[in-house]
């Protein structure tokens, strides 16, 4: 039978519940348990797919094509289990499901209410996501005291009661702020947060106390006394320079022991050697590179969370410190791309909409003409294709119908029929809903032999997608005639998946790659990702070559 660990948060949001839950999951997995994580989001949106990155941050895509909370990216980076659609659900999905059942008459004429119908539906979703695992960690979004979170907390309380003794544990993450004026840590917000949780009927088995410094024993004892949590279960979680130190921090204070005792589990001892090695590699780099990332959401770097982590993973596996500087594509559009000359490599990530796109096109051209390693992801590939079509292939009016619906040369266009990750044929048009109408999830395609992509991936590539627009095959042949290499295509529709510049000949470039998919979703600190590792190696080579020029 699956055991449950519910992770809640108090005082303020953005304390790091996802990192805490993923770190505990990593420890439990190292103890031989089969572990998964679920994220319960209280917002009414069906999923985050149509939410602004400034509102929500990154949308993480699972292998089976779900658009989910960015915390699922943390989950996959900390444990080996892959997340699925069932690992993330929202208030919107719950109400949508309950209303469908009511319309079908499944409630037999009863008055449909939050209790029991909504809370029962939440429990059903939790059990569905946890099926087949020894332990499921369930992160409840929001903050205790929020109206939106109440049905989820009530469902967790009911599930714990129904599942019986030793079937569920509650871990509460809270803030212990340091007041400079008083010169001390303040425990009162934590006391009130636990009190609020207990009013709901939930008594935490462990407290994770976030602070900017380790919490002294006397303060932990005070928190224990007023929150009715054993002192050894009051865990100090202070600011760390890398999230990959958190598993060791929690293990050193016995959080996994407390949880296992509560759940009556006796697994093997933990082995955190993989995290020790990762942290050592992060703290002892032999090289350094600086990447210029040209995007439109640069004021909120959470929008590129998986991407920045993938670059850091590549740094771990190349013994390099990867410095990332975020550049607003609108500023490049206004002042020109000359500021990019100082970078060891340039990356243009995915995105949507017309704003700042000409700055991204200028960045792609600057990288091509100055032999700077270039990596274009999703939209980053499309702008590189547009740039090459305009300035090399003679298609001077080339554009995407996303930015100019009436463009005379739509080298990038909306695809209206495609095969999804499960083989199902999907269709859409300009009038389709925005939500859930993209090419989503993992797909596999063959890689053209003799290309840079083949050196990186081998014979085939399987990656995750999230986009509506594709390279237009009507123009792709002309661009290929001008020297661009299409090194991978989808098997069913022959859509461009990878494009690159040749490394020899008239249009030679040392490393210039665009991909239609999102490889960052498959990167982990344990293994890195071959494409990002190759990119960082190219950045190192470019940096070395530029330094050699200065010497001579």
Curated annotation (Swiss-Prot):
The active site is at residues 378, 518, 520. ATP binds at residues 14-19, 71. Allosterically activated by GTP, when glutamine is the substrate; GTP has no effect on the reaction when ammonia is the substrate. The allosteric effector GTP functions by stabilizing the protein conformation that binds the tetrahedral intermediate(s) formed during glutamine hydrolysis. Inhibited by the product CTP, via allosteric rather than competitive inhibition. It comes from Herminiimonas arsenicoxydans. The keyword Membrane does not apply. L-glutamine binds at residues 351, 379-382, 402, 468. CTP binds at residues 13, 146-148, 186-191, 222. CTPSs have evolved a hybrid strategy for distinguishing between UTP and CTP. The overlapping regions of the product feedback inhibitory and substrate sites recognize a common feature in both compounds, the triphosphate moiety. To differentiate isosteric substrate and product pyrimidine rings, an additional pocket far from the expected kinase/ligase catalytic site, specifically recognizes the cytosine and ribose portions of the product inhibitor. Mg(2+) binds at residues 71, 139. It catalyses: UTP + L-glutamine + ATP + H2O = CTP + L-glutamate + ADP + phosphate + 2 H(+); L-glutamine + H2O = L-glutamate + NH4(+); UTP + NH4(+) + ATP = CTP + ADP + phosphate + 2 H(+). Catalyzes the ATP-dependent amination of UTP to CTP with either L-glutamine or ammonia as the source of nitrogen. Regulates intracellular CTP levels through interactions with the four ribonucleotide triphosphates. Pfam families: CTP_synth_N (PF06418), GATase (PF00117). Residues 1-265 are annotated as: Amidoligase domain. This is CTP synthase. Its EC number is 6.3.4.2. The lineage of its organism: Bacteria, Pseudomonadati, Pseudomonadota, Betaproteobacteria, Burkholderiales. InterPro entries: Class_I_gatase-like, CTP_synthase, CTP_synthase_N, GATASE, GATase1_CTP_Synthase, P-loop_NTPase. GO terms for cellular component: cytosol. Homotetramer.
């Amino acid at each position: 039978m699956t055991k449950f660990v519910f992770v809640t948060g108090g005082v303020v949001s953005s304390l790091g519940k996802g990192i805490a839950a993923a770190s505990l999951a990593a420890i439990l997995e190292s103890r031989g348990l089969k572990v998964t994580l679920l994220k319960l989001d209280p917002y009414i949106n069906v999923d985050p797919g149509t939410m602004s990155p400034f509102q929500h941050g990154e949308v993480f895509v699972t292998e089976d094509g779900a658009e989910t909370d960015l915390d699922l990216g943390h989950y996959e980076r900390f444990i080996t289990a892959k997340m699925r659609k069932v690992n993330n659900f929202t208030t919107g999905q719950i109400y949508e499901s309950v209303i469908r059942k009511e319309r079908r008459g499944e409630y037999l004429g009863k008055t449909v209410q939050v209790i029991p119908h909504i809370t029962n539906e939440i429990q059903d979703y939790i059990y569905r996501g946890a099926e087949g695992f020894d332990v499921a960690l369930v992160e409840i979004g929001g903050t205790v005291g929020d109206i939106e979170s109440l049905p989820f907390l009530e469902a967790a309380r009911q599930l714990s009661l129904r599942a019986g003794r030793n079937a569920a544990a509650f871990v509460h993450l809270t803030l212990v702020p340091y007041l400079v004026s008083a010169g001390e840590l303040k425990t009162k917000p934590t006391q009130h947060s636990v009190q609020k949780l207990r009013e709901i009927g939930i008594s935490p088995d462990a407290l994770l106390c976030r602070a900017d410094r380790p919490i002294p024993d006397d303060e932990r004892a005070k928190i224990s006394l007023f929150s009715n949590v054993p002192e050894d279960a009051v865990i100090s979680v202070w600011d760390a320079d890398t999230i990959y130190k958190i598993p060791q921090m929690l293990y050193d204070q016995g959080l996994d022991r407390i949880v296992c005792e509560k759940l009556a589990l006796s697994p093997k001892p933990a082995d955190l050697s993989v995290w020790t090695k990762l942290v050592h590699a992060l703290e002892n780099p032999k090289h350094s590179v600086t990447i210029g990332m040209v995007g439109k959401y640069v004021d909120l770097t959470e929008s590129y969370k998986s991407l920045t982590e993938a670059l850091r993973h590549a740094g771990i596996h190349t013994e390099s410190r990867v410095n990332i500087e975020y550049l607003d594509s609108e500023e490049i559009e206004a002042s020109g791309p000359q500021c990019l000359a100082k970078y060891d490599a340039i990356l243009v990530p995915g995105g949507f909409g017309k704003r700042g796109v000409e700055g991204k096109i200028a960045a792609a051209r600057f990288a091509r003409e100055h032999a700077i390693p270039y990596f274009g992801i999703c939209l980053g590939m499309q702008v590189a294709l547009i740039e090459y079509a305009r300035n090399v292939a003679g298609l001077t009016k080339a554009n995407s119908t996303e930015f100019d619906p009436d463009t005379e040369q739509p080298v990038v266009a909306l695809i209206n029929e495609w095969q999804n990750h499960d083989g199902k044929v999907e269709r859409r048009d300009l009038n389709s809903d925005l939500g859930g109408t993209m090419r989503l999830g993992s797909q596999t395609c063959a890689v053209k032999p003799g290309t840079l992509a083949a050196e990186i991936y081998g014979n085939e590539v399987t990656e995750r997608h999230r986009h509506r627009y594709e390279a237009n095959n009507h123009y792709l042949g002309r661009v290929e005639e001008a020297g661009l290499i299409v090194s991978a295509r989808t098997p069913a529709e022959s859509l461009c998946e990878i494009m690159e510049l040749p490394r020899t000949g008239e249009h030679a470039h040392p490393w210039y790659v665009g991909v239609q998919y999102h490889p960052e979703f498959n990167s982990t600190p344990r293994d890195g990702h071959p494409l990002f590792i190759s990119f960082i190696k190219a950045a190192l080579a470019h940096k070395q070559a530029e330094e050699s020029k200065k010497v001579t």
